[in-house]
């Protein structure tokens, strides 16, 4: 059974960092706490599994080209018998029990994934700052301006910071690229790992509207 919970965010002015207004969003959450953990675990495994890619791939004796002819006759040469020069015992032969390419696919329902994201949005509520327009002063790629903007909200780049905007701009991407603890995401591309990892979240007001529409179906 799902319950509805109201989250009231204070909209902080980008000029003087004072509260300008407030905005309310309603998130649907699971009533059972053990179900929340289960859903989060499923969503996390889904994302991590689908990012795995085992490329190492060795060939068995049946896959190595050549070796169709018997190297020498079975008897009379004094040598050990051999049926193919692509045997794993031979140089250039196949590999026994070597690594094989494998796809790690873990499926999850859309509603389960959305519920997991809503649970995390609720859990990170106290560590979330909503700004009127965070990127107003960044018209060219400039990491220093970005760091100074974060400091205005008492955010330290030594902590993991997630910036959520309504639309990713190239200037903002280039400004955050050099900061290892700062991640930039568009509101329509939220993911479990980024939300779990973030110590602080800063959201554009327009991005909050997108989150409210997208993840509450």
Curated annotation (Swiss-Prot):
InterPro entries: Ribosomal_uL4 (IPR002136), Ribosomal_uL4-like (IPR013005), Ribosomal_uL4_dom_sf (IPR023574). It is found in: Plastid, Chloroplast. Keywords: Chloroplast, Plastid, Ribonucleoprotein, Ribosomal protein, RNA-binding, rRNA-binding. The keyword Ubl conjugation does not apply. One of its GO terms (cellular component) is chloroplast. GO terms for molecular function: rRNA binding; structural constituent of ribosome. GO terms for biological process: translation. Residues 51-85 are annotated as: Disordered. The keyword rRNA processing does not apply. Part of the 50S ribosomal subunit. Belongs to the universal ribosomal protein uL4 family. Probably binds the 23S rRNA. This is Large ribosomal subunit protein uL4c. It comes from Gracilaria tenuistipitata var. liui.
């Amino acid at each position: 059974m799902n319950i509805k919970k109201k989250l009231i965010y204070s909209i902080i002015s980008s000029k003087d960092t004072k509260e300008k207004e407030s905005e309310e969003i309603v998130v649907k959450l699971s009533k059972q706490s053990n179900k929340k953990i289960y859903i989060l675990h499923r969503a996390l495994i889904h994302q991590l599994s689908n990012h795995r890619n085992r490329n190492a791939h060795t060939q068995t004796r049946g896959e190595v080209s050549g070796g169709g002819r018997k190297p020498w006759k079975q008897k009379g040469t004094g040598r050990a018998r051999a049926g193919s020069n692509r045997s794993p015992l031979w140089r250039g032969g196949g590999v026994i029990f070597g690594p094989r390419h494998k796809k790690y696919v873990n499926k999850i329902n859309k509603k389960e994934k959305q519920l997991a994201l809503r649970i995390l949005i609720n859990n990170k509520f106290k560590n979330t700052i909503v700004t009127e327009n965070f990127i107003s002063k960044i018209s060219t790629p400039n990491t220093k301006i970005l760091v100074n903007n974060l400091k205005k909200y008492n955010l330290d780049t030594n902590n993991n910071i997630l910036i959520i905007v309504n639309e990713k701009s190239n200037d903002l991407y280039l400004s955050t690229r050099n900061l290892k603890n700062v991640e930039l995401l568009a509101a329509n591309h939220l993911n479990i790992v980024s939300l779990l990892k973030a110590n602080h979240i800063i959201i554009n007001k327009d991005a909050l509207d997108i989150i409210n529409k997208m993840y509450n179906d």
